[in-house]
Amino acid sequence: MTLANLQEVADIFTDGGTVMTALLIVAFLLYTTATASLYFVVRGNLNNSQRKEWEKWIETPENAEGRIGEIIRYTVHGKRISIKRIQRRFDEVREILIRSIDRRLIIITTLIAAAPMTGLLGTVGGMLSMFDGLAAGGGKQSMAMIASGMKEALFTTLTGLVIALPGMFMSLMVRERRNRIDSTLAQLQSAIVTTKFRKV
């Protein structure tokens, strides 16, 4: 990015008025939350790619690997293991993993909705500036006020939409991973119950 490009961005930010600062804050909160959420769902590597190994791991939990291994060890440890106890422990795992992702998704979707709404606030401010310019009558000062109001109205709306769209894609990626994790937990629970209680 050249110095001229940076200057152009700075000019757009200035022309957008005070609402651009609010949009900058919304963008910062949205992208930090979405990035942290993506890291959270990807880091766990909680998927069924090693499903063929699950039965062996359930029989010998100490050999189980990764996050799947941690969940297996947690859900089957203890002498008096029962289907109800496994269910309860899986509910605890879901409470930690799935509910945590859901809370993050609520924040992300709220910020996605806030970005274009904040942009519309700038649009209203810009239109008011345009009306002030029109009310002032003719002349250079009046035309400058109208031009400034038009820039503010357009730049803030555009910026709000530009902030929201990538956030929406990030939200969809987090939601897709969340559903995959939930599905993997259900499959793992079924595999543990089937393996541990197949003789019952």
Where are these regions (language model features)?
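Membrane-interfacial helix-loop-helix connectors in multipass membrane proteins
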Residues: 133-147
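Residue-level signature of catalytic and energy-coupling elements of molecular machines
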Residues: 17, 31, 72, 119, ...
